[in-house]
Design a protein with these regions (language model features):
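Short loop/turn segments immediately following beta-strands, especially the blade-tip
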Residues: 213-220, 322
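Bacterial N-terminal signal peptides
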Residues: 28-38
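A short loop-to-beta-strand structural motif that recurs across blades of beta-propeller domains
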Residues: 73-75, 113-115, 167-169, 209-211, ...
Length: 322
């Protein structure tokens, strides 16, 4: 997620020349789009039309949990209605993940903390710094390391002109050690373990690209490389500007990567070899994240905001079915 409350006056740039596709690239992308499965929007159903800047959808115990960044905390959707499940003032909840079998971690972007909950929503602890004593700045999203530990992004400042301070940190499986494993990322956002289990993909939102890091045996990350640039995956939409980019990213049960393109109202579904498989369009322009239910990739839950510039920051949660 990106956060307009911290940057109301700054977002006035249009797409820069370096992000504008060339004529040859545009033609190639157009052919790719026509050959791909196409835009999948007919199967989109709104399940919460009144969500306040929703994010972080997570299937849990037969229900969908998701956060409201501009709301009280976490909501639960049981298949019929959405209710508030957990509240915390000044949190600015932004991401969710399972931890320690039946616990849940919450990223509090505004509170600069991680909160650990039990299965009933009872707060067990709050963490605001890494093991070296450095405070978190904008905890944003999570990914499993495949061994019980967690990677999470600490985005830094959402300003394209600000110093580049985004980080990725690793939380050990026992919950005792938290260390920085990557830094100088231009607003680190969504992240996911790659299909091979040996790389971590990280959305570098303000650079408009997804990075890949090799994972060492101790969970540390090696030298980064560019996995994909969004401008190489799909044609730009009419209203894109320099702040639009990848938000949440997930490896789907079907082996494809799902990238929430914030500012473009769509999720890009991309194959392992970086080819566009399909796009899923939703009514909210500012798509933040997506998650999967028990049906695997046949059901995708998508969160997004209509207006991130003005309170109460209205948004919606969708269910896309194939």
């Amino acid at each position: 997620m990106w956060h307009a409350r911290a940057l109301m006056e700054s977002r006035c740039a249009t797409i820069s020349e370096k992000r504008r596709p060339s004529a040859r690239r545009t033609a190639r992308l157009l052919i790719t789009a026509l050959l791909a499965a196409g835009t999948a929007s007919a199967g989109v159903q709104t399940i919460d039309p009144h969500a306040l800047y929703p994010e972080g959808p997570l299937w849990d115990q037969g229900r969908l949990l998701y956060v409201e960044y501009a709301g009280p905390g976490i909501k639960s959707w049981d298949g019929k209605e959405a209710t508030v499940w957990w509240r915390k003032a000044h949190c600015g909840a932004n991401g969710l993940i399972h931890f320690r079998t039946d616990h849940i971690l919450v990223a509090c972007y505004d509170g600069n903390t991680l909160v650990e909950l039990d299965r009933r929503g009872k707060e067990l602890r709050s963490i605001d710094k890494d093991s070296s004593g450095q405070p978190f700045v904008g905890p944003n999203d999570f990914a499993s390391d495949g061994h019980g530990g967690i990677y999470f992004s600490a985005s830094g400042v959402y300003d394209i002109k600000a110093p580049i301070t985004g980080k990725v940190l690793h939380l050990s499986a026992d919950g005792r050690d938290i260390r920085v494993v990557a830094d100088t990322i231009h607003y680190s956002n969504g992240l996911t373990l790659a299909k091979d289990g040996r790389h971590l993909l990280v959305a570098e939102m303000l650079a408009g690209r997804v990075l890949s890091f090799p994972i060492a045996a101790d969970g540390s990350l090696g030298v980064r490389s560019v996995w994909a640039r969004l401008q190489d995956l799909a044609l730009p939409t009419p209203n894109e500007d320099a702040y639009d980019g990848p938000d949440g990213i997930k490896l789907g049960p079907d082996g494809n990567y799902y990238i929430a393109q914030n500012g473009s109202g769509r999720v890009l579904v991309v194959s392992e070899d970086r080819k566009l498989v399909r796009t899923i369009s939703v009514p909210t322009r500012y798509v933040t994240n997506m998650g999967f239910g028990p049906d695997g990739a046949d059901t995708v839950y998508i969160t997004g905001a209509f207006d991130p510039w003005k309170a109460p920051y209205p948004g919606a949660v969708y269910r896309w079915t194939r």
